[in-house]
């Protein structure tokens, strides 16, 4: 089968950084689906892996952890899907990526594709949707449909991929007051259109921006970018016993700043379940199906950016 891979970590402008190659067709394990890949999306994780992980023994490493396609075959213990089903998923970083004609993935982290979307639009969703969903409902433990009086969520980086889904989930499915951050007129308008109640400028001190907007503090924070830069401001902005969740990789955080207010810190990494094969892996299947229902109902919208055409090393 055709695939896109790399053999050594090189700058992306190097002609050998990514190569079109031929690989044997993968074989589905007992809980696996063999998927004919129709579309993939590119995420920061692709760049991080390519820059930091060199394949061993001259092997080719295939990237790609957001995909949509059609089930070609199923493993002996598969119960959730059948051949011909349209699916979407983010896969596992412990296995080969989906930048290939065929791909194997555990059924427990796969969802039925939204009926109203094409493959490219669907492939843009899984990683960001899983991250946003787990952060909101599992790490921050926000309940659907209600929130205690005065509860609020500050989303730092609300116009990005995860932020765009998170803003929609929080505004559509909870009673939280949603405050997003954006620094340009275009992104401010985007975040407002996604349902944020307030939009503040993250190029300015966040606690001061909140006060100017009439929001002296917040009960929850989702820090999606530059957490180390904003950390002191986020601690100041959080109400006592508030919760801070993050997804990025800050170099160092002085968490002793959290003690005085009894603040809690939560990390969200959507690959944890598949990486460690946790007992609740099936939750990602369930949430992807729920996201598909919300997309088809018009409650959520996809965040596909630019379509690059055929899947190959050049693109």
Give the residues covered by each predicted segment:
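A structural motif shared across PLP-dependent enzymes of the aminotransferase-like
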Residues: 94-107
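Mid-domain Rossmann-like dinucleotide-binding core that forms the NAD(H)/NADP(H) cofactor-binding site
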Residues: 123-204
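Residue-level marker of beta-strand positions
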Residues: 85-86, 102, 152, 243
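Short, glycine/polar-rich helix-capping loops at beta-to-alpha or helix-loop-helix junctions
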Residues: 98-99, 183-190, 252-255
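Glycine-rich beta-strand-centered segment in the early N-terminal region that forms part
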Residues: 24-41, 51-94
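Glycine-rich cofactor phosphate-binding loops and adjacent beta1-alpha1 units
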Residues: 144-146, 194, 198-268
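C-terminal substrate-binding/catalytic core of Rossmann-like NAD(P)-dependent dehydrogenases/reductases
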Residues: 257-308
């Amino acid at each position: 089968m055709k695939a896109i891979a790399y053999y050594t970590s090189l700058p992306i402008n190097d002609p050998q950084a990514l190569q079109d190659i031929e690989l044997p067709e993968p074989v589905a394990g007992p809980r696996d689906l063999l998927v004919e890949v129709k579309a993939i999306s590119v995420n920061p994780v692709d760049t991080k892996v390519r820059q930091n992980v060199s394949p061993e023994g001259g092997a080719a490493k295939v990237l790609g952890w957001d995909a949509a396609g059609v089930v070609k075959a199923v493993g002996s213990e598969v119960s959730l899907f059948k051949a011909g089903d349209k699916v979407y998923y983010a896969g596992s970083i412990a296995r080969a990526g989906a930048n290939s004609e065929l791909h194997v993935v555990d059924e427990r982290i796969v969802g039925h594709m939204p009926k109203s979307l094409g493959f490219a639009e669907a492939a843009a969703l899984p990683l960001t949707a899983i991250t946003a969903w787990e952060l909101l409902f599992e790490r921050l433990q926000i309940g659907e449909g209600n929130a205690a009086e005065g509860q609020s969520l500050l989303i730092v980086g609300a116009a990005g991929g995860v932020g765009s889904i998170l803003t929609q989930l929080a505004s559509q499915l909870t009673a939280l007051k949603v405050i997003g951050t954006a620094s340009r007129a275009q992104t401010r308008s985007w975040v407002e259109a996604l349902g944020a109640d307030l939009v503040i400028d993250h190029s300015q001190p966040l606690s001061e921006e909140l006060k100017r907007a009439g929001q002296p503090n917040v009960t929850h924070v989702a820090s999606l970018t530059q957490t180390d830069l904003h950390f002191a401001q986020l601690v100041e902005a959080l109400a006592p016993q508030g919760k801070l969740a993050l997804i990025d990789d800050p170099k160092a955080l002085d968490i002793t700043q959290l003690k005085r207010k009894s603040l809690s810190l939560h990390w969200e990494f959507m690959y944890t379940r598949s990486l460690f094969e946790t007992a609740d892996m099936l939750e990602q299947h369930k949430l992807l199906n729920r996201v598909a229902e919300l997309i088809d109902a018009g409650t959520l919208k996809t965040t596909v950016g630019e379509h690059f055409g055929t899947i190959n090393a050049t693109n």
